[in-house]
Amino acid sequence: MGDIMLSTVLVANRGEIACRIIRACSEAGLTSIAIYAENDAGSLFTELATVAVPLKGDSIGETYLNQQQILAIAAQYSVDAIHPGFGFLSERADFAQAVIDAGINWIGPSPHAIEMMGDKMTARMTMKAAGVPVIPGEEIESDDELSLIHI
């Protein structure tokens, strides 16, 4: 795998995690693009970023979870990578894949890893197969909660 040269990173998160990512970008000499909802205007992460771009919308779904809007901002600013932080879009395999499909570097686990670890049963089986100690417990999946009472 070759080295990837980055110059601009879009931080697709807010608050303390965004501050940490932006500081790391700054220390590495990278331009950081923060995105923010109206109620986060003036927050520390928007002040620390090289550029802060407002998101349109009133709810989390319309702002920090709006994949199309975030990808459009990434394209507008010609970012080299997107860092999702944790929570929000970091747990969305479809977003990770959309970033990669757009030709932008994804800073995070692969879409496949996100899918595998997002499902607790698959995660347990994957970890056990890899030899990672797992707390003992039943490995039964059921949509019928009443049937699980008798286990």
Predicted region positions:
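N-terminal beta-alpha lobe that positions the nucleotide/phosphoryl donor
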Residues: 2-149
